[in-house]
């Protein structure tokens, strides 16, 4: 009888031991799963995800707004067809045509005063090289007559430009004066002490390098 | 001895299953999270897609060529001054009333002789200045316009005097001519003085006619 009791006790012990081990293993698995779940749900990773989303959305929104503004600004300032690309390089208050900048005065003065005023602006009274240029100046001058760079010592001397080059007789100069000016009729001349508005011109430094490639304004 | 061992194994297996299945289930519920996160995620995705579409459309517009305008040089138009009218004395259209005269200011510039002819066609003459007040008024007018004007005063080489178009000789106390006294010289009024210019030169001019009672 005592042998049987001893056997039963040992079997019981064995049962308990095995059960405990198995349960422990199960608990370990559960903990592992728990850890995984916690990691996926953890506030840190969630916040990071939200931040990523937020940043991407903000960046895209800013891009869309910027592009919209750029488009609206662009439409307000249309590109001019056949515009001289060099015009933009003229100083404020000057008008560009071809490779030159022209200034039309508001004040009046005699020819010498006009030339001095142009020299003070690092330029000289206007020269024209072509009929197109002359037509442009006539159109732009408005109703008032303007001194230009043509002059001569007397009615018997040849016409020369303000830069001391000889006039090519491109256009007939009428009138009986010693100084040339632009009128509605073309080029006329008056006495040097009379008062008129004037036109200065200078060349644009950037335009000079592009002279061969600059298209004529039609 | 063999029989008791087999029995023990079977018991253990049953015990394991029963004890270990129940604890994980409540934790699995926690894994799903709340519903609003899902909705927020979906909305975020939709927003992103819309933004990307907008971006592509705008880029497309930018790449397109902008509208083209022809060059135009702004020419300042000359505004005509309003005609001064009175119930008794009236000037023709485009003429200006100055005391007892109607004055016409030319819109273009031409030699003196052409100005004279133009005034004649209008039933008038080139301007004659009667006194200092009239001279001052016209000089102020010249200043405002930024222009000079031929008037009806010319140098007569034979008599070596300046004469008005009505034949009277210039009274040098009234106005003084600045410049040359020589052949082919005509008077040009400016904002400060009266010049002698070449009659062949182009200039604007002023016509006058006596006022008629209407």
Curated annotation (Swiss-Prot), chain B:
Q: Which InterPro entries match?
A: C-type_lectin-like (IPR001304), C-type_lectin-like/link_sf (IPR016186), CTDL_fold (IPR016187), KLR_subfamily_B (IPR051527), NKR-like_CTLD (IPR033992)
Residue ranges annotated as transmembrane are: 43-63
Q: Where in the cell is it found?
A: Membrane
SUPFAM superfamilies registered for this protein in UniProt:
C-type lectin-like
Q: Which residues lie on this side of the membrane: Extracellular?
A: 64-214
GO MF: carbohydrate binding; signaling receptor activity; transmembrane signaling receptor activity
Keyword annotations: Disulfide bond, Lectin, Membrane, Signal-anchor, Transmembrane, Transmembrane helix
Domain of life where this protein originates: Eukaryota
How this chain sits in the membrane, per its record, is: Single-pass type II membrane protein
Q: Chief location of this protein? A: membrane
Q: Ranges in the Cytoplasmic compartment?
A: 1-42
Q: Name one GO biological process term.
A: regulation of natural killer cell mediated cytotoxicity
Which pairs of Cys residues are joined through disulfide bonds in the record? 119-207, 186-199
User: Where would I find the C-type lectin domain in this sequence?
Assistant: 98-208
Q: Which PROSITE patterns match?
A: C_TYPE_LECTIN_2
Q: Known Pfam families for this protein?
A: Lectin_C
Q: Which GO cellular component terms, listed alphabetically, does the Swiss-Prot or TrEMBL entry include?
A: cell surface; plasma membrane
Q: What protein does this entry describe?
A: Killer cell lectin-like receptor subfamily B member 1
The species is Rattus norvegicus (Rat)
Q: List the lineage, top down.
A: Eukaryota, Metazoa, Chordata, Craniata, Vertebrata
Gene name, per UniProt, is Klrb1
